[in-house]
Amino acid sequence: SFYTGYPRFKFKDEELIPKGKIISVPQLVTPFMFLERYSLWPYRKLRDQFSFLSHQHLDVTVSKNIVEPIILISFCAAGLHSFRKNKKLGGINICDKGSTHIEYQNEIMKEEYLRYGMYPREIYQRRIDKELREYHEADFITVPSKFVYDSFIKKGISKEKLKLIQYGARI
């Protein structure tokens, strides 16, 4: 099955995944995306908390529906509970991370804010904590570039756990 926080209509033209396999869990992601799209967040902290909760909601929903061992691929910050359930059943867990190691990312952002004399906006701590646990509990972490790969190595993640899968295609 393919679980998503996006509403079902976003997949109306999807041809590669059978319609019956797409399970939409939009209760928190849809309002989050609406507020994000139109910059309607009154406070950054509220945005960060809502984002964390939307990932958490999807994660818990998926975990409740795992009944046998599977190969589970989850975007980072949305798989910890599912990983734990799947691991108990003997499954394989893959954390898909499209950007650098969360601590590395936070450090670079902080440096850049300070470089330009701005107040640093750090990543929401609960997200950092959850991602770090996911890195530890995942069997593999997929990353899209050598730069991202190297950020994980610098933060102590083993080469054996990392899988470099570059985005794009050669046509």
Regions found by a protein language model. Give the residues of each.
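Generic beta-sheet signal
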Residues: 2-5, 96, 144, 165
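Short beta-strand scaffold positions
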Residues: 73-77, 143-144, 164
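Short acidic capping loops at alpha-helix termini that bridge into adjacent secondary structure
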Residues: 159-162
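Acceptor-binding helix/loop patch of EC 2.4 sugar-transfer enzymes
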Residues: 32-49, 92-129
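A conserved catalytic-core segment of Leloir-type glycosyltransferases
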Residues: 4-57
